[in-house]
Amino acid sequence: MKILVCTDGSEQSEKTLEKTLVITEGCNVDEVAIIHVDDEKVDFSAMPVGEGHVPTEKEMERFRKMQEEHKSERKKILQDALKVFQENNINARTIFKEGHPSHTIVETAHKEGFDMVIIGSRGLSGFKKVFLGSVSSAVVQEAKDCIVAVVK
């Protein structure tokens, strides 16, 4: 069995990692991959804008630095999750992608032939739907060729 586990660095994601460890103990798991999909956009409000304004080299450099810091923070989420599996002697790999989270998760699961997607019921958005977060709900709806386990 191939398992794709989703993380966004939230407390719910930590629970998802813990439940994935339990599942790997009881199943014949061939592969575990941890995916993080970055849909965050770096805030452009830090750059002065206006009609006729051309950003200076210093402004552009500051913006590039903000982008790199953001990407580094996102990749650290994956490295922290990977460490959880390594500490439990489970081979795992990481997948970092940019895009719409639910679509990217489902597409990755389909293209790479994952048998199961494990995702938390809510993530970092802070917006709470009645039963599921918007990403987990969309993954449940869109994933047609694999099992989706939602961790509460």
PLM feature spans:
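General small-molecule cofactor/ligand-binding pocket signal
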Residues: A33-I35, R93-K97, A149
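Absolute protein N-terminus
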Residues: M1-K2, K152
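Phosphate- and divalent-cation-binding pockets in alpha/beta enzyme and binding domains
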Residues: K15, T104, G126
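A short acidic, glycine-rich active-site loop
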Residues: P55-E73
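Gly/Ser-rich helix-loop-strand patches that form or flank binding pockets
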Residues: E107-K152
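Small/aliphatic-rich secondary-structure junction motif
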Residues: K2-E61, N88
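Active-site-adjacent beta-strand anchor residues
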Residues: C6-T7, I95, G120
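Structural beta-alpha unit
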Residues: K76, D80-V117
